[in-house]
């Protein structure tokens, strides 16, 4: 065994803690400095706009991060809460754009052309969506009989050549 290990093993717990404390403190400071550096990189554009050509201290970086978060939170609150219908529409539009982009990247086949034509048609008018009164609650599915749902599904399939799950 090395002499240093024997000496450490013979120390009391209080003495071990006294020796370990500077190492733990250095690790903590390194974590803090690393996080501040990451904040600086994330908010680099914000810093350039407010304080160009200045050396930023750690306190400046933290203050700027706090003000940026407050500003973005206030901006989100000013935009107002979105309804479930808006969220659904935005998600659907994004998904549709991704699908069209994917289809246009590859060589055009007959099926791809039909899909592109189908996606680019204007959507049929949708039934109004009822929102739940409590925020954060899951939307309740519409109650209908299976025969009515099946007849609507078959009429939609026969109306257009492509099957759609909606």
Curated annotation (Swiss-Prot):
Region (Disordered): 125-166
Protein name according to UniProt: Transcription factor HES-5
Domain notes: Has a particular type of basic domain (presence of a helix-interrupting proline) that binds to the N-box (CACNAG), rather than the canonical E-box (CANNTG). The C-terminal WRPW motif is a transcriptional repression domain necessary for the interaction with Groucho/TLE family members, transcriptional corepressors recruited to specific target DNA by Hairy-related proteins.
Positions of the bHLH domain: 16-72
GO molecular function: chromatin binding; DNA-binding transcription repressor activity, RNA polymerase II-specific; double-stranded DNA binding; protein dimerization activity; RNA polymerase II cis-regulatory region sequence-specific DNA binding; sequence-specific double-stranded DNA binding
One BP term from GO: negative regulation of astrocyte differentiation
Tissues of expression: Expressed predominantly in embryonic neural lineage cells.
Start-end of Low complexity biased regions: 142-156
Native species: Rattus norvegicus (Rat)
